[in-house]
Amino acid sequence: RKKQLIPFFKFKPVMILEGDYHYKTRSFLTSFYGKKVLKIAPDNDFINTKVDLNNLPPPNAIFTTKSDRNLNFLLDAWHQIKKKSIQSKLFINPPHSLTDINVQDDVILRKKGEKNLLIEDLVNSRVFITPGHKTEVFCLAAEEARELCVPIVTMGFGSLYERVEHGLTGFVAKNKKEFIEYTNLILNDNNIYYKLKDNLIKRKNSRNYSHVKSDLIKLLNIDE
């Protein structure tokens, strides 16, 4: 923007970005004076929620990011997933106009509200599924799911490949066929689910806002 050009050249800002994908895709012109990575963290409400390894949620999937982040891809894949996961339901965020096919496929609009409702919905889900999107520079929704030890299946679009350790905390699919297969695997194979969940529990609270604060101070070279 024209009004920002003079302050930009005057103050020479270094851009602070949220991850590797964000770093790689930031244009040269908007990071002319440099760029650094500062990974964010989920809120303490997610970090402080206790997760029971032995709890087996119903075989449901959840998608808690925006509908413009490849939801159509997801709903099309879910139509195929549903054929092998007959008892499963998919919970997505409103607003969205469900088609008759969506309703038949047990796609359900979540009730949006307090954060505790989101936490409850995530804890009661077997898998978090999201293709990802080129505009996702971090995807806090996926990070919140990971903090609550919900395995993730993604296509890895945008920054989503950064939120998943393939085969350890979820799966990064190479194509839609794999996306469908990996989702069905977690929904129907309790051993796979428990293995992924155990790995996630071991990584729980690996990054919180104390870490973010410390890293920011280092980036800014500030003495506490």
For the regions a protein language model found, what residue spans apply to each?
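Conserved catalytic-core segment of nucleotide-activated headgroup transferases in glycan assembly
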Residues: 52-115
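Short acidic/histidine- and often glycine-rich active-site loop of Leloir-type glycosyltransferases
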Residues: 157-167, 171-172
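Short glycine/acidic-rich beta->alpha loop that forms part of the nucleotide-sugar donor binding site
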Residues: 136-139, 146, 156
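Short alpha-helical segment that forms part of, or immediately flanks, the ligand-binding pocket
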Residues: 119, 142-147, 161-162
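A charged, aromatic-enriched C-terminal amphipathic alpha-helix characteristic of glycosyltransferases
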Residues: 174, 190-221
